[in-house]
Amino acid sequence: MKTGAGTHGFFGIYKQGKIVDEEADKFVAAKSKSGVNYQYFKPVNKDDGKKHPLIIWFHGNGEGGYKDYQNNVSQKLANRGAVAFAEDKAQKIFGGAYVVAPQADDTWYNNYSKGYIKSVKAMIDEFASENNVDKNRIYIFGASAGGYMSFRMMIEYPDYFAAFSTSAAALDKAAISGGVATTAQDLMKIRNKPLWMVHAQNDPTISYENTSKRVYDVL
């Protein structure tokens, strides 16, 4: 190409290729027979003849679908909740674990009114039966609204899950946003279940005193 100054220059054409996220791309999108959209990861040693634990990750508010828009991807891209368990370090700790991240059609606050409790349980049963899952080692993790969902799943099926962990579980918000109140009587059903709660005392969104601290005091 000759420029106005009489000199010669060159230019190239760049075409954007596929954007690669090595962590997120380890997951595969699926939909259960019960109608739940989810992403799943299978450990590299899944075919070693052994049973492996299953980790369920419940996303927070704002990472579900919205009306007719269901992307089945926000729950793994919004934060490193699910993808962190697919890391080599985490996989080594668990000896190779399956990871499943379901996505609510809207919000987990509607877990009873829209039947998410039962449909998600059916999804877990289906996935576990189709893979080499150790049904004695199914763990729940959840953040914010997903923490609320984690509590409700554990309360409804206390003998099904081995343990659970929550980060700023939105028990207070759920009770006024379409969900149900988690009572002391509810919590007594899971009194002997292993639980690890993570919550900042100065959390400006989810009250530490009204949620994690209250649960700790009851249990």
For each feature predicted by the language model, list its residue ranges.
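Loop/turn elements at helix/coil->beta-strand transitions in domains of secreted/extracellular proteins
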Residues: K50-I55, F94-Y98, S129, D134-Y139, ...
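The feature captures the conserved acid-bearing segment of alpha/beta-hydrolase catalytic domains
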Residues: A162-L219
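Short, solvent-exposed loop/turn and secondary-structure capping segments
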Residues: K50-K51, G65-V73, N111-K114, R152-M153, ...
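The conserved beta1-alpha1 loop
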Residues: P53, F58-G60, A168, H199-A200
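Short glycine-enriched nucleophile-adjacent loop
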Residues: G147-P158
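Active-site machinery of serine-nucleophile hydrolases
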Residues: L54, F58-S119
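Gly/Ser-rich "nucleophile elbow"/oxyanion-hole loop immediately N-terminal to the catalytic nucleophile
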Residues: K46-K50, W108-S144
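A domain-start/cap signature at the N-terminus of enzymes
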Residues: M1-P53, V215
